[in-house]
């Protein structure tokens, strides 16, 4: 039986940090017209959470974001929707100024259509504070995330990042790193396990990316990771498995 987080997070009918790990699919669409169809395709695959990576859509403004969120809700029904506008420095496609990106995130929170929001831990208190306040007011759980597409810190460093995210007000802490050896994958899983043993109380997302790190996406829940990301029509990060393959492998490892 996998170790659960002390703090459980509720998001439109799902429990994050409970007995069952959840699978999230990224929604990537380059144009407004593509978005509803792509969303419908992903919903049919049966994810637990859908992540709209709005940074994949260039030129979208605040008004369009709100309108598209309402349109998405009509397509996805009650499926929990995570809103992410990933900055380029952490593997995203957003080249906007920080103020423009912040405006999109705040508008999404104001819309009432999202149930989770992701912001990078490195964005700093000045950028995070308005999002944190708005998320609290909207009762929308906040994911504070850290991505390193070049290397994997030692387990102590990864654990420190989980702790920093919790201290900064995260409801969920996410760390995704790139391994250069099998030992790096073990460092990620070790840090997750130590966090779950008591160092961190909130739910965790722990990912080792690329082909070396695939095992973390499948077996991560055994070490305390609460959400894993799969590929639908398109992967949003290296190493994501198709959702059907991921669920089958997880069922085998977790004994479901």
Model-derived regions: residue spans:
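Short boundary motifs at domain starts and secondary-structure transition points
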Residues: 12-18
């Amino acid at each position: 039986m996998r170790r659960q987080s002390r703090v459980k997070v509720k998001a439109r009918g799902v429990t994050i940090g409970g007995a069952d790990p959840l699978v999230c699919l990224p929604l990537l669409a380059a144009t407004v017209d593509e978005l509803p169809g792509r969303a419908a395709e992903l919903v049919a695959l049966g994810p637990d959470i859908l992540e709209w990576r709005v940074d994949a859509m260039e030129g979208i403004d605040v008004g369009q974001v709100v309108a598209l969120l309402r349109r998405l809700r009509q397509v996805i029904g009650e499926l929990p929707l995570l809103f992410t506008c990933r900055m380029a420095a952490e593997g995203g496609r957003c080249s906007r100024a920080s103020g423009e990106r912040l405006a999109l995130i705040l508008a999404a929170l104001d819309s009432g259509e999202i149930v989770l929001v992701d912001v990078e831990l490195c964005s700093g208190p000045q950028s995070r504070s308005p999002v944190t306040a708005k998320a609290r007011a909207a009762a929308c759980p906040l994911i504070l995330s850290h991505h390193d597409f070049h290397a994997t810190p030692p387990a102590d460093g990864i654990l420190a990042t989980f702790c920093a995210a919790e201290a900064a007000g995260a409801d969920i802490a996410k760390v995704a790193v790139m391994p250069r050896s099998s030992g790096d994958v073990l460092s990620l899983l070790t840090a997750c396990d130590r966090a779950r043993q008591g160092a961190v109380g909130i739910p965790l997302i722990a990912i080792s990316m690329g082909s070396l790190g695939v095992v973390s996406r499948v077996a991560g829940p055994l070490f305390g990771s609460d959400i894993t990301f799969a590929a639908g029509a398109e992967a949003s990060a290296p190493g994501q498995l198709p959702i059907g393959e991921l669920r089958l492998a997880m069922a085998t490892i977790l004994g479901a």
